[in-house]
Amino acid sequence: MKRAFIMVLDSFGIGEAKDAKSFGDEGADTLGHIARACARGEADIGRQGPLHLPNLSRLGLGKAALESTGRFPEGLDENAEVIGAYGYANELSSGKDTPSGHWEIAGVPVLFDWGYFHEHQNSFPQALLDTLVERANLPGYLGNCHSSGTVILDQLGEEHMKSGKPIFYTSADSVFQIACHEETFGLERLYELCEIARDELNKGGYNIGRVIARPFVGDKAGHFQRTGNRHDLAVEPPAPTMLKKLVDEKQGDVVSIGKIADIYANVGITKKVKATGIDALFDATLQEMRQAGNDTIVFTNFVDFDSSYGHRRDVAGYAAALELFDRRLPEMLALVKEDDILILTADHGCDPTWHGSDHTREHIPVLVYGPKVKPGSLGERDTFADIGQTVARYFGLSPMAYGKPMF
């Protein structure tokens, strides 16, 4: 029985990519800088001491980071007995965004350039804004700028609740984000507005990767909180991913947990499981692993590393979340059967010690575990697509156009 379990620790980079300088990210190192802060007592909020990741270390995380950066992460166990295969991968795709990283993991790198809204103020074309106001019957809009999602809620949340005007904002990624209060504006109305925005962006040829619904609750600045009802409206991958090939060629199953289905625009997904928070995502993953049959991929995105800690530049929070994941990892390893493979990886970096609030261009870890997987180094991989090619070969699918099998 063949089953693959793919876990994306969203934004968990392990050192600057070769082309990091062209992204303004030379020197970025999500894992390394978190580990250094912990070792120096600079991340003792809600946790204490050096970064403690014994189970990820057994899968080769520290050694993969050493290969990536030439430095072993401070505080991690250099003498851990490694029970898995480990390496690191470069990104071939043109961007450092979520769809690019995930599509490339599934064998389809993004070799075109996304469209972006470059202006930090008055970010969106007036014609687009006017059309959205008219089609969605809006009283107007707020924002129209680059911003961190949490900052803009404190700045404009109260005005939004009073006026009924949605908050439009973007970032360095190819995104059009819309924040609205779940109760005063309405969740379904927000989703409908996002559908309209997606349609207009498509028709206008803007080539924007995602429209993201950002619902929130609360009653005043400092008390607003984004909810788990986020919804991403992505464009479809430009070629069949290994997910779609598994469904088409083997009539297999692909179980999406978290935002995976949104990222792939539901293409190649046979079941969607919604969960919010690391523990809930972990619980849902374990449940699906227990019931997975032959020719099944269980694919989980642990978004909190990125959304709650990376973008918010919360080093201690990121460290605590990694330690929580690590504590629960033995539960996952125990469910890996004789012919299964478990792959732990990331989609980009988001160094919480870095300037700004955007992603960082980094290598990703590639940690592979299974009773039939030979422990040892997988070395440097030229593309995230090596993961997709490896999974395609494992299931006996037609080869992907990009990537080399790792074993």
From Swiss-Prot:
Keywords from the UniProt entry: Cytoplasm, Isomerase, Manganese, Metal-binding
Binding-site positions, Mn(2+) 2: D306, H311, H359
Domain of life the protein comes from: Bacteria
Cofactor note: Binds 2 manganese ions.
Entry's EC annotation: 5.4.2.7
Pathway(s) annotated for this protein in UniProt: Carbohydrate degradation; 2-deoxy-D-ribose 1-phosphate degradation; D-glyceraldehyde 3-phosphate and acetaldehyde from 2-deoxy-alpha-D-ribose 1-phosphate: step 1/2
Reaction(s) this enzyme catalyzes, per UniProt: 2-deoxy-alpha-D-ribose 1-phosphate = 2-deoxy-D-ribose 5-phosphate; alpha-D-ribose 1-phosphate = D-ribose 5-phosphate
Cell compartment(s), UniProt: Cytoplasm
GO terms assigned for molecular function: magnesium ion binding; manganese ion binding; phosphopentomutase activity
Positions with a binding annotation for Mn(2+) 1: D10, D347, H348
GO BP terms, alphabetized: 2-deoxyribose 1-phosphate catabolic process; 5-phosphoribose 1-diphosphate biosynthetic process; metabolic compound salvage; nucleotide metabolic process
Cofactor(s) this protein requires: Mn(2+)
This protein's GO CC annotations: cytosol
HAMAP family the record matches: Phosphopentomut
Family: Belongs to the phosphopentomutase family.
Function: Isomerase that catalyzes the conversion of deoxy-ribose 1-phosphate (dRib-1-P) and ribose 1-phosphate (Rib-1-P) to deoxy-ribose 5-phosphate (dRib-5-P) and ribose 5-phosphate (Rib-5-P), respectively.
Protein's UniProt name: Phosphopentomutase
Organism: Edwardsiella ictaluri (strain 93-146)
Gene field: deoB
